[in-house]
Amino acid sequence: MKNIAILGDSLIGLLSALILSKNKNNIYIFRNAQEDSERENIERYFSINLLSKYMFMKSGIWENIESNGIQPYKKIITWNDTGNEVTFNSRSISYDYLGYIIKESSIKKAIEEKLSKLENITIKSIEEVSCIDQSENNVINFINKKKLKYDLLLLADTRNFNVFNNLEINRITHDYNQSALVINLKLENSISEKIAFQRFADNQIQGLLPISSNEFNLIWSVNSSEVDNLFNKDKVLLTKILNDQLSSRIGNIIKISDRIVFPLSGFYVKSYVYNNIILIGGSAHSVHPLAGLGLNMGIQDIFILDTALNHEKNTYINEKSLNYYNNNCIKNNKKLFYTINFLKKFYENELLALSIKSKALDFFNKSLILKSQVIEEATGIKMLNSVLSEGYSRPNNY
């Protein structure tokens, strides 16, 4: 049996624990310090792609999540104010859906219920840790002077970097100079077809995720200098602004929720492995939310790690398996990082003539091959089919 420590109880940390527990390892989860109570009281939604669904099914939590309500969608429609439109359809890759909108609380509850039934899971608080020093040969030091020797340590949250004495992480960063305003919108009428929308306008991006038959979750990315103005507007005025921008697509908005704001920044690490310490999920990368891939990228990290370790069943954790994880995470996440940044810059570039943008978007929208390739990347189908010999199919629960 191996000792695996996971710093951070984010969704990525918890799902990592569940996936890695299957080989009867001793799993130690170190919960983060309590978060801001205001953020805790606001429900978050995620767009889950097909690779993430596969991992939820493999870990045996999909049926639990599904029973608490999900919103599948078949189409994504993007448009800008000059009239250009691009439509992505699940038919392009011969699947029923492109993704699923799921509450964060539903995912977390399903994982925690599964973990609570496992005897090889130990929950601790990160506040119990005094320091972790690589020179001490894979040991976690506790405030009470006790020690825990680990075979593998997963760092799943950037908030926990401070417990390391000598861990230097090299990162490539990108300042988007934007913040995201998150609001739930209630419509006057129901929409029969579940579609995710995205509107590109001057220095702003509005992503709309269907969360019920007459509600959308709006992620509104705007320049940081403008976000306070929007945040402080009264609900009546803000509803009018949103109706002017969005009602032609989703219908009349009659009510909006309270709103939250969070800053946007991008980064990726140059290496995911530091001896027996590995970075995963939010500790390793952050991207603009325009593609809705943040959580999915973290779950893809777990998929790659699980694949790497299961390729080495005899020794399980060794240099070869960790190199596999490191190399594949670097290759895939770096590509996604720069692709997302390119798309953002393309839509915002005022120096690029509108006629050129229009022709490029029209060509792309008519190219079934190009769109299919993009969809396969974004949904994780390409990754699944490249690794699984049988292709993407329903895995056995365990």
How should these model regions be labeled?
Residues 3-5, 9-73:
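Glycine-rich FAD cofactor-binding loop and adjacent beta-loop-alpha segment at the N-terminus
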Residues 7-8, 30-31, 156, 281-282, ...:
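Active-site flanking residues adjacent to catalytic metal/cofactor-binding acidic residues
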Residues 56, 152, 156-251, 257-259:
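Conserved FAD-binding catalytic core of PHBH/FMO-like flavoproteins
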Residues 57-58, 62, 70-166, 174-182, ...:
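Conserved N-terminal helical subregion
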Residues 228-317:
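FAD/FMN-dependent oxidoreductases across multiple families
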Residues 307-398:
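C-terminal helical "tail/cap" subdomain of flavin- and related membrane-associated enzymes
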